[in-house]
Amino acid sequence: MRRAERAVTDREKILRILDACHCCRVGFSDPDGAYIVPLSFAFVPGTPDRFYFHGAKEGRKAALIAARPKVGFELDCSYALVEGTSGCSYSCRYQSVIGTGRIGEVTDMEEKKQALAAIMAHYEPEKSFAFTDEQAQRVAVFRLDVAELTCKERS
């Protein structure tokens, strides 16, 4: 990280920042170039830390996950413009998380249902959600096992 003074290393603060984010962008690479997908997500801390996503069972994203599971990811929040006296002196406040990991499809039905409930809980923390096998079978659920994660902020 070039600006080490902006690094966030406190685990609890990183978890709060992740909780404040609404979108996780996952980046893939294939022979045609880079491909970035914005996704709804759940973050589950552990060893390893994990992100869960859901989506279609077919398409470019699903094909890339099967063929090239090494990915990068990015989340950001708390963006605010900092005005300056000239265009070159403008800046912004932000919090961001970036990292790398391996992504794959979840096939265990119980893990799929728990992942879907965790995704919903991220966006509706005051509600409880349960999914049937039939509902979970209709979508693909993907798990990203985090290999590296860094967090940065400018406040």
Residue ranges and their predicted role:
Residues 2-5, 78-155:
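Charged, gly/pro-rich active-site loop segments
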Residues 18, 64-65, 119:
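A generic structural signal for nonpolar/aromatic side chains embedded in well-ordered alpha-helices
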Residues 42-80:
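A short mixed-secondary-structure module that forms the rim of ligand-binding clefts
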Residues 21-57:
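Short beta-strand segments
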Residues 1-19:
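Extreme N-terminal tail/first-helix region
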Residues 28-30, 55, 75-77, 146-148:
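Short, structured patches in soluble enzyme cores that scaffold and shape functional sites
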Residues 8-10, 20-25, 125-127:
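Short Pro/Gly-enriched beta-strand edge/turn motifs at strand-loop
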